[in-house]
């Protein structure tokens, strides 16, 4: 009985770790949103609507503003 209980617990632990590996890891992804400009909170609103993330306007080297969206994703 003790061996079968130990074997059962061991199998459950192995299966649990396999499921965790299959599901993937959470990470922070980022994407430039060209569909919007950076005026009046539109970057933040679009990022929140599309990816449930946080949008922020950043300035490029040629002094243009681009919307950068950071969101949680699975890799």
UniProtKB/Swiss-Prot annotation:
InterPro entries: DEFL (IPR010851). Its main location: secreted. Residues 1-24 form the signal peptide. Keywords: Antimicrobial, Disulfide bond, Fungicide, Plant defense, Secreted, Signal. GO terms for cellular component: extracellular region. It holds the Pfam family SLR1-BP. GO terms for biological process: defense response to fungus; killing of cells of another organism. It is found in: Secreted. Disulfide bonds join 29-73, 38-57, 43-67, 47-69. The keyword Secreted applies. It comes from the Eukaryota. PANTHER family: DEFENSIN-LIKE PROTEIN 127-RELATED, DEFENSIN-LIKE PROTEIN 184-RELATED. Belongs to the DEFL family. This is Defensin-like protein 127. It comes from Arabidopsis thaliana (Mouse-ear cress).
